[in-house]
Structure formats: C-alpha cells, structure tokens
C-alpha cells in the first residue's frame, strides 16, 4: 500500500483498540496463541523471553490489543523499524470474534495508525497457513501482492510450540 486508505469505519459496539506500551512476553504470547493457534502461528512462541521482550519494547514496534466489552479478542503489531515503511507484522482475532466485521474495522484502523507516521509504504506478509479470508481482506483494504515466496519450517505441533491438536484443518506433515 503506497497511500493512506480512507477513514476507518466506526468500531463495532463494545469493541476498542488500545496500545500496549510494553506487553509482558507471557501475556503477549497468551493472546498470540489464542489468535494464531488455529493457523499455526508460532514465530513469537519459539522466542525466549529476552528476544521477544526486545522486539516488543523496541521503539519501532507498536503492539495493540483488541477488546470487546473489556475482554481481549485480538491483536495487531506494527513494525516501523525500516525507515519510511511499516509492516503489519501480525493482525488477528480469536476464532469466536471472527465473522462480525471486527476484522475489517481492525485492518482499517491499523492502516490509519500506520499512516500517521512518515511512511511511503505499508505492507504485510501473509501465508497459506493464515485464514483463507486474510488475503482477500488485505486486497479489499488496498494491499497489492508484489511477490510470492516459499518458506519451510518445522510443524509447530511436532516441535511442541503448539498443542498437537491445534489447527486440525491443516494436515500434519
């Protein structure tokens, strides 16, 4: 995305986005796991506390929690560490919060936040292990695919980063 999107819609009733100044690694991991386990998100789970804390407390990293009626239901992480750019590192909702328009609002809201900084590019990496609704949502929001890569990693259910019963819709190799 090379230009700011239009204004974000109003948040759904009872839903809010708040910045975590410096989330504790274990609290962050707990929400990351709730959001990402259905899609085998594991990258933050395998970092030790010191490495994760270094990322989360970096001045170029912004972490946001999505709440509904005070309960955490999602997260967003923006990475401004590359000058002039922002990467949407993570964005997601817990399974029970999907399908009601919160994700569309969240994506628009974080895009607006990203463009408050002096950037000329806002980008996201997604993968086949993400929700099948992710790529269409990113395209609707104004992101344009620029390349495709193949990444291979050990299955986090085998390594123990996630429970063996996580993401049953994804074949275990």
Give residue spans per PLM region.
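Terminal substrate-recognition subdomain of acyl/acetyltransferases
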Residues: 1-14, 144-173
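Short amphipathic alpha-helix that is part of the acyltransferase structural core
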Residues: 11-44, 164, 171-172
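A conserved beta-strand-loop-helix scaffold within acyl/acetyltransferase catalytic domains
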Residues: 43-50, 56-95
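Short acidic/polar active-site loop segments enriched in Thr and Asp
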Residues: 62, 120, 144
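Conserved glycine-rich acetyl-CoA-binding loop
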Residues: 94-108, 117, 129-133, 140
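Conserved beta-strand-loop-alpha-helix junction that forms the acyl-donor binding cleft
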Residues: 98, 124-134, 151-157
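Conserved GNAT acetyl-CoA-binding A-motif
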Residues: 114-126
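Conserved acetyl-CoA-binding loop of GNAT-fold acetyltransferases
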Residues: 115, 137-148
């Amino acid at each position: 995305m090379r230009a700011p999107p239009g204004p974000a819609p109003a948040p759904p009733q009872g839903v809010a986005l708040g910045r975590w100044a410096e989330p504790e690694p274990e609290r962050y991991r707990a929400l990351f796991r709730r959001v990402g386990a259905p899609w085998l998100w594991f990258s933050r789970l395998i970092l030790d506390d010191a490495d994760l804390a270094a990322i989360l407390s970096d001045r170029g990293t912004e972490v946001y929690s999505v709440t509904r009626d005070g309960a955490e239901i999602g997260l967003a992480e923006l990475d401004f560490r590359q000058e002039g750019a922002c990467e949407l590192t993570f964005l997601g909702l817990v399974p029970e919060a999907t399908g009601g328009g919160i994700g569309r609002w969240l994506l628009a809201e974080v895009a607006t936040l990203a463009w408050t900084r002096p950037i000329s590019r806002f980008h996201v990496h997604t993968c086949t292990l993400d929700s099948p609704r992710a790529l269409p949502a990113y395209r609707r929001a104004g992101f344009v695919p620029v390349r495709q890569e193949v990444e291979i990693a050990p299955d986090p259910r085998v390594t123990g980063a996630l429970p063996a019963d996580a993401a049953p819709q994804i074949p275990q190799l």
